[in-house]
Amino acid sequence: MTAPAEATIVELWRYPVKSMQGERVTRVALDASGFTGDRRFGVVTPEGFVLSGKSEPRILGASAAVRADGEVEIELPHGVRTASNDPAVDSLLSAWLDRPLRLHRAATDEQFMIHHQTDPEDETKTKDFSTPPGAYYDSRSTVHLLSQSSLRAASRAYGDGQWDVRRFRPNVVISFRNGAFDDDEGFVEEAWVGKTVALGDVPALVRKRTERCVMTTRAQPGLDRDLQIYRSLVKSNHANLGIYLVPQAGGTIAVGDIVKVLAQ
């Protein structure tokens, strides 16, 4: 598999609250800890577990967006709005999901546990893992990149599926399309694993492919629950879709910026 040396950023996403719907942005600052405002808040249980759509699918029904002051606006499925600095936010979240909960901003010196359903076909198969300090990521990699060509390739393998980018929660969506390359092969960004790429002017190490899980099958606004999404990815690409990166410096990137492989 080969990938062209360049692509174009066509979408940027961040997810201010772990497993809630994210927001599409045109420009964002980032560093080794990821996008500014990405997964910096989580909904936490009294036992110290942060809720994830892997084990609590209902949380995907809420949405979150970062305000100019750094606080987060939250809209719950029944239309109630709250915010990270609202004294009532914990009680509203608890009432919505019918359990004691609190909204928590991640600190650089603390970690939380995530309860993970490991098998989309069997909800009894689970494991727990810890988040990295300072954010509620599932991985030590802090930026997720996905190409439009990979989405198209996945959809060809299962044409009846809703292959909406929101199922896969990328930070960066790229297009390889140009006059010299037809990107319909799919999954070509995986050829960048182990290399350093530049997102605009920001260098980032491509650490690994993104292995998918039950999250891809969950229902969310406008998308149905669909186990065949995951089953199809297992057959077509060993359950992988996209790549994980870690920025090696700080900077700002924008839609329209070029992504290119740096000299190794």
Predicted ranges, named:
Residues 1-264:
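Metal-cofactor-dependent catalytic cores
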